[in-house]
């Protein structure tokens, strides 16, 4: 039995949807990692700026992996 053109079109669209979904998941993960790195860099730059001006930065502490976290 030979598959029809409609079956072939469905398979093409289905494969395109799977490929798009896999690319989108990778892009979202990259964007999340980039946003976190930028937030950490800005927070660290803010701490360094305040320390350079002689002001206290007691509200923040550098946690594991170099991430800036609020002191408890």
Swiss-Prot record:
Signal peptide (from-to): 1-27
Transmembrane regions listed in the UniProt entry: none
Domain of life: Eukaryota
Keyword list, A-Z: Secreted, Signal
Subcellular location: Secreted
Cysteine disulfide links: none
Keyword Iron in record: no
Proregion residues excised on maturation: 28-45
Tissue specificity as recorded in UniProt: Expressed by the venom gland.
GO terms under cellular component: extracellular region
Coiled coil: none
Family to which this protein belongs: Belongs to the formicidae venom precursor-01 superfamily.
Protein's job: Peptide with unknown function that does not resemble any other pilosulin-like peptide and appears to have a coiled coil structure.
Protein name as it appears in the record: U-poneritoxin(01)-Om7a
Species whose genome carries this gene: Odontomachus monticola (Trap-jaw ant)
């Amino acid at each position: 039995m030979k598959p029809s053109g409609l079956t072939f079109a469905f398979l093409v669209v289905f494969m395109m949807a799977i490929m798009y979904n896999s690319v989108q998941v990778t892009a979202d993960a990259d964007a999340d990692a980039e946003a976190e790195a930028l937030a950490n860099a800005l927070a660290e730059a803010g701490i360094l700026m305040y320390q350079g001006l002689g002001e206290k930065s007691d509200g923040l502490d550098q946690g594991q992996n170099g991430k800036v976290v609020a002191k408890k």
